[in-house]
A protein has these predicted regions:
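Preference for extracellular/luminal or secreted protein segments
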Residues: 1-19, 252-454
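Second-shell residues forming the walls of enzyme active-site clefts
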Residues: 2, 7-10, 30-52, 67-68, ...
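A charged helix-plus-loop insertion that forms the helical arch/lid used to bind
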Residues: 74-87, 130-132
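Short glycine-enriched loops at secondary-structure junctions
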Residues: 3-6, 58-68, 108-118, 158-164, ...
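Conserved beta-strand positions
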Residues: 25, 112, 205, 272, ...
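Active-site-adjacent structural elements in enzyme catalytic domains
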Residues: 34-45, 87-106
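Short acidic/polar active-site loop segments enriched in Thr and Asp
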Residues: 21, 108-109, 201-202, 268, ...
């Protein structure tokens, strides 16, 4: 599996060289849904017209919240929000809507959902991507999401086996080590076992060295881990590695070692979003016997028939997004006074959301301004939007900013940081960075909408 960059000429050369069985689309590969559809048609034409072979299965990471590659279709606020709602029919609906939307575009494989149990609140790479801190919650909501996705003709992926919610290190940066005992590992493996039992079509193996499974190699390169999945768990679907360009792998193993360990270990698909590394790995695979009829059978099974003919109503996801925020420290602003909005982050996506929100509020005749942190304010009303203050340290600046002002913090992630803020600062957990989550939170702050306490 390779990642498509925007430079089409180089991409075409790469595809012709590697002939990947699957191509993963990333968020910066397209401008909008129509551009994405054209991209998929262009990819298919290379296979069918130039190479005269079957087209690849197109995959994407459409988990919801911050891992939503397609931002202009309906997507869930976050897995964590679904876990807090904790209704199987709602999680099924979220998967069904995602499956319907992806299938309409031509994407038949979603590298979701995350089935990691959030055991460590400092696990920056997982956080709100997880359904819950509790294994059973992850199992029932994850399985429901999978069933919804697959009922609408899109194969799901249970990731990141055997569960990486307890580690501290981010595999994008270094190799994490899971030193837990075997009982704890099997406990957080339960969501994956339940996913196998309901027929999940693929499992993504993680780049974590799990001491009790293999002391020498990370799960993605470990024959012991593949034997565990195939023989002990009896799984016969697709096994795909997490992206091999992550530093957990790419800085510790050569392309030759990656090719041999992963493929001889019996991974079906090697994911790599770095085109140069993908070519290097492919070159080193030429001397490996890749004949595996089982792999071909598993690939074919990724193409699912859509079982459900109805269209999941889109307004339900909007209702969920409007209603999911919860108060931790309830506080309201006077809507007749001026107020400011400050974004304590840096993503272009969120900056655009804030601009959209300010325009909407001004349409409603609210006196609202975007806060400039160089301004010196006193006795002003400030709405602050951000997340994960316990990891980025922004709580220090926010506490200082709010000494002489009335402030309410809207957290778009998981509210692990509420105790770090001064108690006089109001706190509302939006549990998602969607427009609907944030605008409804602001309406609640202005006394126009009601959210329950957390």
């Amino acid at each position: 599996m390779v990642y498509i960059a925007r430079i089409r000429k180089k991409v075409k050369k790469l595809i012709k060289s590697i002939k990947p069985v699957s191509i993963i689309i990333m968020g910066n590969d397209f401008e909008n849904v129509e551009d994405l559809k054209n991209l998929i048609r262009w990819i298919f034409s290379i296979y069918t017209k130039d190479l005269k072979i079957d087209p690849p299965i197109v995959a994407i990471d459409q988990e919801g919240v911050n891992v939503s590659r397609i931002r202009d279709i309906n997507y869930i606020p976050s897995n964590y929000a679904l876990g807090k709602i904790d209704k199987k029919n709602i999680s099924y609906y979220a998967g069904a809507l995602t499956g319907y939307e992806l299938n309409e575009i031509g994407i038949r494989w979603n590298l979701a959902p995350v089935l990691d149990t959030l055991s460590n609140k400092e696990n920056f790479s997982i956080l709100e991507r997880s359904f819950s801190e509790y294994v059973d919650n992850v199992s029932r909501n994850g399985s429901s999401f999978i069933m919804g996705l697959q009922d609408f003709g899109v194969s799901a992926t249970a990731k990141h086996f055997p569960g990486i919610g307890s580690v501290f290190e981010d595999p994008h940066e270094k190799l994490p080590r899971d030193l837990r005992n075997i009982h704890s590992i099997w406990n957080t493996m339960k969501p994956f076992i339940d996913a196998i039992n309901i027929g999940v079509k693929s499992i993504m193996v993680s780049h974590v060295l799990v001491k009790e499974i293999d002391q020498d190699f990370p799960i993605s390169l470990s024959q012991k881990s593949y034997n565990l999945i195939r023989k002990e768990l009896g799984y016969d679907g697709i096994l795909i590695t997490d992206s091999l360009d992550m530093k957990a792998i790419s800085t510790n193993y050569s392309p030759n070692e990656i090719a041999k360990l992963a493929f001889l270990g019996r991974a079906d698909i090697l994911e790599c979003v770095d085109p140069e590394l993908a070519e290097d790995i492919h070159e080193n695979m030429k001397n490996i016997n890749l004949n595996n009829s089982k792999r071909e059978e598993r690939l074919i099974k990724l193409y699912l028939e859509r079982k459900k003919k109805f269209i999941p109503p889109k307004e339900i996801i909007q209702i969920i997004s409007y209603n999911v925020p919860k108060w931790i420290r309830r506080k309201e602003f006077n809507p007749d006074r001026d107020f400011y909005i400050y974004y304590a982050g840096s993503t272009a996506y969120m900056n655009n959301i804030i601009k959209r929100i300010i325009l909407k509020l001004r349409e409603l005749n609210f006196s609202v301004k975007e806060f400039n942190e160089n301004e010196s304010l006193n006795n002003s009303q400030i709405i602050i939007i951000g997340k994960n203050l316990h990891l980025n340290g922004n709580y220090i600046k926010i506490n200082e900013m709010c000494k002489n002002n009335e402030c309410i913090f809207i957290n778009t992630g998981i509210p692990y940081d509420s105790e770090l803020l001064n108690k006089k600062i109001g706190y509302l957990a939006a549990m998602g960075d969607k427009y609907e989550n944030i605008i409804s939170s602001i309406y609640s702050i202005l006394g126009l909408f009601y959210h329950d306490n957390f």
